[in-house]
């Protein structure tokens, strides 16, 4: 989830003295999960582990999932998406900066009524990308698989946005960028927020 080794440390004073946390561990104490950067196996596994941990800590308390991501691997992202749907706590999603490709699907997959974006953020939907080399028979297998994946992703977006499948298919044919207010009108998010008080607890 972190693209370089510079991770801020937070010093917290307790009755027993001072404790140092990296910033992401400190946010986790507040039930905040942060996806920063590309969706890949490593970042997805970290997010999944945090979601499962927070469910075990309190299955009735919301989780806040902040997303600033250009997207990435479909299989890794769908693992996060399925976990969001599987666990008991509502997962509130908040876009800060960019939620593109798989990032936009994770944003839309948050609990209904609890999907947010800051006003200057951008959201982008499109069809999955594929580039395969090898024998013709293998290319054919991969082509069929990516069409199945495309159909699955379109159905997920249709479910969460309320758009009909035909509209989703047309709108994801090419990169489709939206500002926060456009994403709200489309059904990818529920609220455009300018202050923390606007987030539903």
From Swiss-Prot:
Gene3D superfamilies: 2-enoyl-CoA Hydratase, Chain A, domain 1 (3.90.226.10). It catalyses: Hydrolysis of proteins to small peptides in the presence of ATP and magnesium. alpha-casein is the usual test substrate. In the absence of ATP, only oligopeptides shorter than five residues are hydrolyzed (such as succinyl-Leu-Tyr-|-NHMec, and Leu-Tyr-Leu-|-Tyr-Trp, in which cleavage of the -Tyr-|-Leu- and -Tyr-|-Trp bonds also occurs). The keyword Protein biosynthesis does not apply. Pfam families: CLP_protease (PF00574). It is found in: Cytoplasm. It comes from Francisella tularensis subsp. tularensis (strain SCHU S4 / Schu 4). This is ATP-dependent Clp protease proteolytic subunit. NCBIfam families: clpP, PRK00277.1, PRK12553.1. GO terms for molecular function: ATP-dependent peptidase activity; ATPase binding; serine-type endopeptidase activity. GO terms for cellular component: cytoplasm; endopeptidase Clp complex.
């Amino acid at each position: 989830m972190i693209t370089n080794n510079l991770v801020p440390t937070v010093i917290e004073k307790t009755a027993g003295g001072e404790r140092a946390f990296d910033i992401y561990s400190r946010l986790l104490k507040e039930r905040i999960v942060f996806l920063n950067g590309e969706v890949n196996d490593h970042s997805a596994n970290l997010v999944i582990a945090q979601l499962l941990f927070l469910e075990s800590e309190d299955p009735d308390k919301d989780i806040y999932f902040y997303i600033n991501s250009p997207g990435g691997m479909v299989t890794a992202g769908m693992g996060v998406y399925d976990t969001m749907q599987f666990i008991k706590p509502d997962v509130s999603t908040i876009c800060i900066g960019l939620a593109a490709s798989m990032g936009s699907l994770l944003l839309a997959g948050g609990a209904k009524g609890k999907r947010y974006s800051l006003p200057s953020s951008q959201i982008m939907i499109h069809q999955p990308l594929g580039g395969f080399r090898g024998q013709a028979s293998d290319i054919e297998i991969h082509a069929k698989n990516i069409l199945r994946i495309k159909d699955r992703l379109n159905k997920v977006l249709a479910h969460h946005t309320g758009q009909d499948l035909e509209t989703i298919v047309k709108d994801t044919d090419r990169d489709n960028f939206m500002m926060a207010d456009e994403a709200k009108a489309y059904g990818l998010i529920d609220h455009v927020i300018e202050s923390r008080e606007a987030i539903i607890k």
